[in-house]
């Protein structure tokens, strides 16, 4: 019987999913990325180097794993080719990479529109990465976008590009006063991309479902996180896809019944990039200290991340939506050397106590966090620990409190940046 595990972010992204996928990929045969685009960033430290992946699954760092970019991903071919070449320069083989022929493309006009729309929003800007992801998903929904398979058939690409070309140029020139695109240049560019990527492009739905029939071990790698989900996140400060388990099934092309285990990745504190509610945000020296110690700067944009205490209202919500079975807790070392560590267990709003995240953005902005406080631990104690029993007493209290409040057992604990800095907690 095939074993399928889904790895989902429980907060606003940047939880350290890449490291957890890299660790668990040792046991997998196939690693799948199912949604998002080059707006996501996974950082993995391996072989004494730091790898920053945006589109390619983290399993690519293992020679014997099939790595799939699924149909739910929107692909910027230029960015993907750069990523492939960057890995190859570091001696990492990409021959086991597979790209869905059904995946949608991020076109050059999507990136221009993304940037111009953000400017137009002014103070109401969403804080997008300006990588064209939102406009690409918009065209997908409008049924006017081009797909990966179209790059392999020039006649089909010409036909589909002609349908949208004039309209996109009118928007660029008349609304945003930008230089019009040239049809011939776009065609030549994407035919070239198609030839470079042709060896990787295949029907990944068949490939994945054949792997399930053969009893292969499969890892579904989420990008972004639950609180950025288009339906469940802090709308409109969300992404344009569904980084929840339901979205993985759609974006990979597998039936929900095949998923046996859902692993939620929880950072030991909370961060988010861009605008939107953040009840436990720290706008003081503690927040600055966490940012610097945790190197909390965006993999994709380099923007400093907003930092705050761990919010179990958010994690509880993610456990509920995704049916999370186990938790991988990351970056415990970052909280070292603080005299006190706080955890949010509920929100106070208009005389009521909320234990799940509210739908209303206004309510979320007005919520006052209710904290439990813990004594801190030293970095030296964390770094020395190789097994759970060797962790400092106060850190174990922190971990066991998370388990009690969320109803999900912690089974992995990240204690440093390297792929070796992980403690397995036997339950």
From Swiss-Prot:
Belongs to the adenylosuccinate synthetase family. Binds 1 Mg(2+) ion per subunit. Substrate binds at residues 299-305. CDD domains: AdSS. It comes from the Bacteria. Residues 117-137 are annotated as: Disordered. Plays an important role in the de novo pathway of purine nucleotide biosynthesis. Catalyzes the first committed step in the biosynthesis of AMP from IMP. Its EC number is 6.3.4.4. One of its GO terms (molecular function) is magnesium ion binding. Homodimer. Disulfide bonds: none annotated. GTP binds at residues 13-19, 41-43, 305, 331-333, 414-416. This is Adenylosuccinate synthetase. IMP binds at residues 14-17, 39-42, 129, 143, 224, 239, 303. The active site is at 14 (proton acceptor), 42 (proton donor). Gene3D superfamilies: Adenylosuccinate Synthetase, subunit A, domain 1 (3.40.440.10), Adenylosuccinate Synthetase, subunit A, domain 2 (1.10.300.10), Adenylosuccinate Synthetase, subunit A, domain 3 (3.90.170.10). GO terms for cellular component: cytoplasm. Pathway: Purine metabolism; AMP biosynthesis via de novo pathway; AMP from IMP: step 1/2. Keywords: Cytoplasm, GTP-binding, Ligase, Magnesium, Metal-binding, Nucleotide-binding, Purine biosynthesis. PROSITE patterns: ADENYLOSUCCIN_SYN_1, ADENYLOSUCCIN_SYN_2. Transmembrane segments: none annotated.
């Amino acid at each position: 019987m095939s074993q399928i595990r889904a790895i989902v972010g429980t907060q606003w992204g940047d939880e350290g999913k890449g490291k957890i996928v890299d660790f668990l990929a040792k046991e997998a045969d196939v690693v799948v990325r199912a949604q998002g685009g080059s707006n996501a960033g996974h950082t993995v430290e391996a072989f004494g180097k730091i790898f920053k992946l945006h589109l390619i699954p983290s399993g690519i760092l293992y020679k014997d794993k099939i790595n799939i970019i699924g149909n739910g991903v929107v692909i910027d071919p230029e960015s993907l080719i750069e990523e492939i070449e960057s890995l190859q320069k570091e001696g990492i083989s990409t021959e086991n990479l597979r790209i869905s022929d059904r995946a949608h493309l991020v076109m050059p006009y999507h990136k221009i529109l993304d940037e111009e729309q953000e400017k137009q929003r002014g103070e109401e800007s969403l804080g997008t990465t300006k990588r064209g992801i939102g406009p690409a998903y918009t065209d997908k929904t409008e049924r006017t976008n081009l797909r990966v398979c179209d790059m392999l058939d020039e006649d089909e690409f010409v036909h589909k590009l002609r349908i949208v070309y004039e309209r996109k140029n009118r928007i660029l020139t008349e609304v945003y006063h930008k230089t019009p695109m040239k049809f011939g240049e776009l065609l030549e560019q994407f035919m070239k991309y198609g030839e470079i990527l042709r060896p990787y492009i295949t029907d990944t739905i068949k490939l994945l479902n054949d792997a399930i029939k053969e009893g292969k071990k499969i890892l579904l790698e989420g990008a972004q996180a639950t609180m950025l989900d288009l339906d469940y996140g802090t709308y409109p400060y969300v992404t344009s896809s569904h980084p929840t388990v339901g979205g993985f099934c759609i974006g990979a092309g597998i039936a929900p019944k095949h998923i046996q285990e859902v692993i939620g990745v929880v950072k030991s504190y909370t961060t988010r990039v861009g605008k939107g509610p953040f009840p436990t945000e720290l706008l003081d020296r503690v927040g600055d200290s966490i940012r610097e110690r945790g190197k909390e700067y965006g993999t994709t944009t380099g923007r400093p991340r907003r930092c705050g205490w761990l919010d179990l209202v958010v994690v509880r919500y993610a456990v509920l939506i995704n049916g999370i079975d186990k938790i991988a807790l990351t970056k415990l070392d970052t909280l070292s050397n603080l005299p006190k560590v706080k955890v949010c267990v509920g929100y106070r709003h208009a005389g009521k106590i909320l234990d799940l995240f509210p739908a209303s953005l206004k309510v979320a902005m007005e919520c006052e966090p209710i904290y439990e406080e813990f004594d801190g631990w030293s970095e030296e104690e964390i770094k020395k620990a190789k097994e759970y029993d060797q962790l400092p007493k106060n850190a174990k209290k922190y971990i066991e409190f998370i388990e009690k409040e969320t109803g999900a057992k912690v089974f992995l604990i990240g204690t440093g940046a390297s792929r070796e800095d992980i403690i397995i907690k036997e339950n």
